[in-house]
């Protein structure tokens, strides 16, 4: 099986880059810059990722870059540098790197000035294309032995270079990000240049993970953290296929679930999997520990720690349990700063990862931690899981606690459950649910004055969020648009939702819609 080695210098997009390579049915692994070179020297190609550091301030080029270039000199093994990776390659080949003067973030337009194997049948000379930039440093002059493929139109920055003879390529932009035009096609060309076999599939991943789980667990018992979401459901189905009745499924009602969630999910999972599921109501425990807590990181860590404590308690009741299964996926790990490359910057802690206590009495089984959400759904289809589960919108482990900005109270939970239920039901009514990546309501810590029935009100503000995405790493505001059957337009839909919430949910007198993309915002508010 062909392998592409990605050297991770700390980019938030590194795991997404790996996803894009696997999407091309090519196996890839991610390594830190201090990896022993013997572990990666048999790769078919190397990709140097982006990263938050500045090449301009580096004392010396990392040893791994020297080793890769030396190997390339002997064998012409293809090398691709992205953003920071481009700057490392350029600096190695005697180009100056300058800081700040030509920084670009977000959408940028390129002018293609040269043909190349990596742009073959994708971009023609003279074409202008939109890409996604995220850099403060720039390559000042053309590296020795290289030619420029493209410049940034606005800043006239070197955006793409090549040394065709040695099969070394560099991109200042991020081809792996959804918003880069033809980014996947560029990566596909790089894979072709490397001569990689396209034989890695979700079916092969399924087979391999079953072997991994069996080897890790042996004949020991596993307790499964079931939430009813896509991730935990697929993880449970995969683990159950691997070890059968050694798996014990537990559904924790933490009091932070959506309206009637516990009842709906338990019925759905039992019908789908025919596995016994124990429902444990610990809502009072979670709510008591969250009392007076307003900081989102504290909330996440408290919920994560309590989550583990409860599961350890349930494991003790079963007896002989040594493993805890969780539905952790790649974006959870990335945003917690716990990706394979440890140089990335933490965005937020996730209850499955950043909130775990340092010392645990249960070992973790995380069969999905290498997959993105869309891959998880593909794996679910391989496992025969119904669309009713697979197409559910993502729901965070900390639940409504991070959709209530500020202190979590029973009053706010009830308000949010009711408002969110109205919003989602109207989305489903107009057949929008399956084309929206994620939609939810948020209770803000802001009260505003209103008038209802000739009386003054002073109620909470509810924010609505709906986004489009393919992987959860970048996201845009869902525009609603015009439904061809109902002719419902953006404003009319939001007005219907707003009226329904204000008229039916006590305590809310104002509704707003969040139009912010990711980045700069995250999808969740906390």
Curated annotation (Swiss-Prot):
EC number from the UniProt entry: 6.3.5.2
Pathway, per record: Purine metabolism; GMP biosynthesis; GMP from XMP (L-Gln route): step 1/1
Keyword field: ATP-binding, Glutamine amidotransferase, GMP biosynthesis, Ligase, Nucleotide-binding, Purine biosynthesis
A family per Pfam: NAD_synthase
Residue numbers annotated as active site: 83, 174, 176
Enzyme class name: ligase
Domain GMPS ATP-PPase: 200-392
Reaction(s) catalysed (UniProt annotation): XMP + L-glutamine + ATP + H2O = GMP + L-glutamate + AMP + diphosphate + 2 H(+)
Keyword Ligase appears in the UniProt entry: yes
One Gene Ontology cellular component annotation held by this UniProt entry: cytosol
Annotated ATP binding sites: 227-233
GO MF annotations in UniProt: ATP binding; GMP synthase activity
Source domain of life: Bacteria
Domain Glutamine amidotransferase type-1: 3-199
Subunit structure: Homodimer.
HAMAP family linked: GMP_synthase (MF_00344)
NCBIfam families listed in its UniProt record: guaA_Cterm (TIGR00884), guaA_Nterm (TIGR00888), PRK00074.1 (NF000848)
Function in brief: Catalyzes the synthesis of GMP from XMP.
Protein name, as recorded: GMP synthase [glutamine-hydrolyzing]
Protein source organism: Ehrlichia canis (strain Jake)
Encoding gene (name): guaA
